[in-house]
Amino acid sequence: MTALRLGSLFDGIGVFPLAAVRCGIEPVWASEIEKAPISITKRHFPDMEHLGDVTKLDGRELPPVHIITFGSPCQNLSQIGNRKGLAGEKSSLFFQAIRIIREMREATNGLFPAIAVWENVMGAFSSNDRMDFKAVLGAFTDTD
């Protein structure tokens, strides 16, 4: 039986890969741009490929994975942030993850990823009178 494989976008310090390993899932690649978190994940996951900036990735070219996890930037969704929501410069990066998921599914005839997991702040539920969360749900259900 093939082990489940994980790709992590907006990886931070590698919490999703850490949880994956504890569940017998193999972290294959990660996308992160901050140097300090990358140094942490390289130490904990020396075999995991680090891909850099999510905006420069093409899901059709990434090694296919069963699970894509991501915690896209929350600054514009947070209740203590500017509340620009998904239209904000940082939080709009959510759509980059959705793009990558769609591209990978296109390249694998819908086989990969089978699961996508998004993590974010509570403000994501209420941002823009809940319309941002409605957009999130719509993006996930429109990834065929």
Q: PLM features: what roles do these ranges have?
A:
Residues 1-144:
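Conserved active-site and SAM-binding loop architecture
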